[in-house]
Structures are given as C-alpha cells and as structure tokens.
Amino acid sequence: LKYYDLIEISIKIYVQEGSQKGVLKQVLTLAKERKIQVQFVPKQKIEKVVSGAHQGVAAQVAAYQYAELDDLFAAAEAKDEMPFFIILDELEDPHNLGSIMRTADSVGAHGIIIPKRRSVGLTQTVAKASTGAMEYVPVVRVTNMVRTMEELQKRGLWIFGTDAKGSSDYRTMDVDMPLAIVIGSEGFGMSRLVREKCDFLVHLPMRGKVTSLNASVAASLLLYEVYRKRFPLEK
C-alpha cells in the first residue's frame, strides 16, 4: 500500500464572483454535496491559479498531505528496521528536494523532516522532480527543528550533521543505530543551532578545486553509505 493511498486529497474550488449560473451552478451543488471548500474570488485570483483560459472556475489540489513524526517511526517499525530519517535544514530548491526524495525512496529511508519556515514545501515542481517518489516517502513539516531534533534524540535517534569542517570522514560513520542525517541549505549549510544539536559531524572529502557539492548529490552519497553498511553484499 502506497503512503499516498493513506492520505486525503485536499481540494479547493475558486469561483469568479458573480458567476453562479449554468454549469457553474452544478459545480457548486456537487461541491456542497462532497463538502469541498468553495471560495468566491475576483477574476484576477483565478487567473493566477490558471495559466490558460478559464470559464470562471478553477480547482486547486493539494495532492500530498504532510505526515506526523509518529508516521516515520511507524514506517520503520512496519519494516522491522532501525529508524533512518533525513532532516533538511532550510533547503530551498524544489529540484533538490525532489531529487533527495528519489534517493530516500531508493535506499529505503523512512521519511524526511523539513521546517515550515525558509524551506521549500511539497509543490508540483517537487512532485515532478521526484518522479513519483513523493507518493512513497512521508514528509513531516515542523515548526521548530531544534526541538524536533531533541525529541528524536529522546526517542533513541543519533543525529549526523554534514559539515565541511566535520571532524570525521563520512565513510567512518557507524550506522548500526537509529539515525537521522541532516543536510544543510544550498548556500549556507546547517544553521548554527541545528549544528550544535547534532551528535556527530561528518564531511565529504574533496580532492578537487571546488569546495562543496550540490545538496542533493551530497545527500545521495550519505544515504547510500547508510544503505551500503546496513545491507552489505553477502560473501
């Protein structure tokens, strides 16, 4: 059963003010029967929602609802696995989020945690970039990331932060424990408070001239390192 099947799709219908005749009247009747929210708005509002021609009505669909933290723990328990979460600290690029979701699904991570502020949310662009992974990877959106990290630690997780000045090479990570990996923002990395809450700091060795990797590339390397160690090849 896909995670997507467990959530309720949210729909809002915008109707142009003064347009309640003919087919629109039927739309309003059906919306009322199905308890769908209807909002009467100026024509300009509908034109912002619909890029092309319209007939005085538009529907806005939120095809993904955010999960709760308990859902991530439940996903790990259902697989009889140690929790493996991803924390994204103020990631703003929707393509990076979509790409990270693809990798998270590939390695069997149990979910992603993002902040409500200064972070990209679940949008159509993210859905497209994830190429379907958004249907399978639960995402939790939290108000206070530091407090969430504290809660995770109280529930037994060890948190690995990625930092260019990290004290350990990421290849030395011990992943035989419940864990979460923090990926910082594209331009600034992890915030100071988030960094201070991490149990371990690791870095990706760089032998070339550039000093950093794209957030989604760095995430892919770290997530597959966890996968490689948790599911080693049989000799």
What is the role of each PLM region?
Residues 1-77:
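N-terminal positively charged helical leader segments and presequences
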Residues 23, 119-125, 188-197:
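Short, glycine/polar-rich helix-capping loops at beta-to-alpha or helix-loop-helix junctions
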Residues 42, 62, 89, 115-116, ...:
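Short beta->alpha connector loops at strand-helix junctions that form conserved
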Residues 83-131:
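Hydrophobic, well-structured mid-protein blocks that either form specific transmembrane helices
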Residues 92-99, 144, 213-217:
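Amphipathic alpha-helical repeat scaffolds
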Residues 110-168:
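Histidine/lysine/aspartate-rich catalytic loop segments that bind and position anionic ligands
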Residues 128-133, 192-235:
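Structured adenosyl-cofactor binding patch, chiefly the S-adenosyl-L-methionine
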Residues 160-214:
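Active-site/ligand-binding-proximal alpha/beta "capping" segment
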